């Protein structure tokens, strides 16, 4: 499972002026942010209850669109992980620190797909900062 924000504005990344280097998000000068990454999850019979057999690669962090920004698209992707697949050590170290939000920015679902295959299911929701000032 991965949960990814597809609308992260460029100003959320420190010192970013090279927009061509960003993983494309939805809209100009937008990128992505990883909010959750679980792997080694299996459906356990008889009721196919999901059970995780490892710690999350990136612990869950809830949606947090910046105040004053448009609604953000959050997508939950489900991948069928290949037998014996484990994340790269560098990724494990990079995402392990839940308080380091910059390490989770510019996340590439496409790069993950090259390792484990295309998503087999997905769902999404929209949310925005409830403190936004509405106009018109």
Regions found by a protein language model. Give the residues of each.
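N-terminus-centered regions that define maturation/targeting leaders and the start
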Residues: 2-136
């Amino acid at each position: 499972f991965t949960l990814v924000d597809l609308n992260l504005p460029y100003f959320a990344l420190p010192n970013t002026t090279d927009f061509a280097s960003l993983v494309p998000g939805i809209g100009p000068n937008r990128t992505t942010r990883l909010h959750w990454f679980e792997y080694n999850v299996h459906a356990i019979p008889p009721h196919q209850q999901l059970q995780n057999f490892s710690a999350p690669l990136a612990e869950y962090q809830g949606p947090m669109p910046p105040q004053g920004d448009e609604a953000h698209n959050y997508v939950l992707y489900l991948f069928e992980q290949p037998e014996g697949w484990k994340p790269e050590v560098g990724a494990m170290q990079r995402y392990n620190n839940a308080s380091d939000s910059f390490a989770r920015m510019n996340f590439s679902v496409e790069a993950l797909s090259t390792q484990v295959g295309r998503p087999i299911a997905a769902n999404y929701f929209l949310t925005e900062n409830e403190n936004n000032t509405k106009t018109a």
